[in-house]
Swiss-Prot record:
<dbReference type="GO" id="GO:0048029">
    <property type="term" value="F:monosaccharide binding"/>
</dbReference>
<dbReference type="GO" id="GO:0003872">
    <property type="term" value="F:6-phosphofructokinase activity"/>
</dbReference>
<feature type="binding site">
    <location>
        <begin position="118"/>
        <end position="121"/>
    </location>
    <ligand>
        <name>ATP</name>
    </ligand>
</feature>
<comment type="pathway">
    <text>Carbohydrate degradation; glycolysis; D-glyceraldehyde 3-phosphate and glycerone phosphate from D-glucose: step 3/4.</text>
</comment>
<dbReference type="GO" id="GO:0006002">
    <property type="term" value="P:fructose 6-phosphate metabolic process"/>
</dbReference>
<keyword id="KW-0479">Metal-binding</keyword>
<dbReference type="GO" id="GO:0047334">
    <property type="term" value="F:diphosphate-fructose-6-phosphate 1-phosphotransferase activity"/>
</dbReference>
<dbReference type="GO" id="GO:0042802">
    <property type="term" value="F:identical protein binding"/>
</dbReference>
<dbReference type="GO" id="GO:0061621">
    <property type="term" value="P:canonical glycolysis"/>
</dbReference>
<keyword id="KW-0324">Glycolysis</keyword>
<keyword id="KW-0418">Kinase</keyword>
<dbReference type="GO" id="GO:0005524">
    <property type="term" value="F:ATP binding"/>
</dbReference>
<feature type="region of interest" description="Disordered">
    <location>
        <begin position="74"/>
        <end position="94"/>
    </location>
</feature>
<feature type="binding site" description="in other chain">
    <location>
        <begin position="288"/>
        <end position="291"/>
    </location>
    <ligand>
        <name>substrate</name>
    </ligand>
</feature>
<dbReference type="GO" id="GO:0046872">
    <property type="term" value="F:metal ion binding"/>
</dbReference>
<dbReference type="GO" id="GO:0005945">
    <property type="term" value="C:6-phosphofructokinase complex"/>
</dbReference>
<feature type="site" description="Important for substrate specificity; cannot use PPi as phosphoryl donor">
    <location>
        <position position="120"/>
    </location>
</feature>
Length: 366
């Protein structure tokens, strides 16, 4: 075997945690260490650790036995080095952070930085590449909204968790003849609500990509009741928008929600349903439950595939790429193609049609 292009690389996890991070870390590090003989520097708490120089040499004992563990052994943060901190009027703080990252990258004698994260993480990775650093990305998020990959690790585990929650809510909704509103994550993309909503038999699914009208939701619930269905399940993505909200600017929506004083979109929808129909309505917000715990077998497999593919890129010196899954094959795509792009649910996605075919309502009157 020829000498690897990468001798030493740093690895960090950035952004929100999700199931599969440790499996991906394990995939990268085991392949890089045992197959290619590379040295690995673990960077704590995402980009913040690289700013502060919080890093250490990893040994096999560090990445053994972590395949099934949730969270991340490296810790994470939502540090965005190219953005000024809250209260900063200019970009000086951001510039200092970027300078610190570049300085510590060289102090640690890194040939490359491997980052595991979502959209913001990969945008930063691309900017660091533009600043002269070698970077490789691995896509993780339960939202499944990273452009360029068919699926991200963490997504399927979250679908499993949300679907199980919907299954459990069916029995209590049936027992009390209630409308149960369950809110799942998905601020700008409704993949999680769509997949879990269909798998869990949701009667109504509300996602950001399809603005809803309360009148259509009410009509669907009342029609179900007239047919003898005494309970209903409404699956709401946290970023779902009413038709009225979809025509507003971001700032206008913020003001409206602040005025309404509902803690989340799920509570707003539940309140409006009960007010309009008189049906007893309850809310469950899954929140961080969706991001925690043991990754599903699918996510362990996907994260391992992504990790070993990243090790291969390190070996070849094929930097500036994000590992992705396309049509069942693991590929590498340029970071520049990924940065600042979002993968949302197309309104004509086959799963939308599947859901409509079994009578699921999206609140749009179709």
């Amino acid at each position: 075997m020829k000498r690897p292009a990468t001798r030493t690389f740093g690895i960090l996890t950035s952004g929100g945690d999700c199931p599969g991070l440790n499996a991906a870390i394990r995939g990268v590090t085991k392949a890089a260490y045992w197959r290619y003989g590379m040295s690995i520097i673990g960077i704590s708490h995402g980009y913040r650790g690289l700013i502060e120089g919080d890093a250490r040499l990893l040994h096999p004992r560090d990445f053994d036995g972590i395949l099934t563990r949730g969270g991340t052994i490296l810790g994470t943060s939502r540090e965005k080095p190219f953005k000024p901190d809250p209260g900063e009027k200019d970009s000086e703080a951001g510039s200092r952070k970027v300078e610190a990252i570049i300085e510590n990258y060289h102090k640690l004698h890194l040939d490359c930085l491997v980052v595991l994260g979502g959209n913001g993480t990969h945008k930063t990775a691309y900017l660091l590449q533009q600043a002269g650093l070698n970077v490789i990305g691995l896509p993780k998020t339960i939202d499944n909204d990273i452009w360029g990959t068919d699926v991200t690790f963490g997504f399927h585990s979250a679908v499993d968790i949300a679907t199980e929650a919907i299954d459990r809510l069916h029995s209590t909704a049936h027992a009390h003849n209630r409308v149960m509103v369950i809110e799942v994550m998905g601020h700008k993309a409704g993949w999680l609500a769509l997949y879990a909503g269909i798998a869990g038999g949701g009667d109504i699914i509300l996602i950001p990509e399809i603005p809803y009208d309360l009148a259509h939701i009410v009509h669907h619930l009342q029609t179900r009741q007239q047919r003898g269905k005494e309970f209903s399940i409404v699956v709401v993505a946290e970023g779902a928008l009413s038709r009225e909200e979809s025509l507003m600017s971001k700032e206008e929506r913020k003001k409206r929600r602040k005025k309404n004083r509902f803690p989340t979109k799920g509570y707003e929808v539940a309140h409006l349903i009960q007010e309009a129909t008189g049906m007893e309505t309850r809310v469950t917000v899954l929140g961080y439950l969706q991001r925690g715990g043991t990754p599903s077998p699918y996510d362990r497999l996907l994260a391992t595939r992504f990790g070993t593919a990243a090790a291969e890129l390190l070996y070849r010196g094929d930097y500036g790429k994000m590992v992705a899954l396309r049509d069942g094959e693991v590929v590498a795509i340029p970071l520049g193609e990924v940065a600042e792009k979002l993968k949302t649910v197309p309104p004509d996605h086959p799963l939308i049609d599947t859901a409509r075919a079994v009578g699921t309502c999206f609140g749009d009157g179709v």
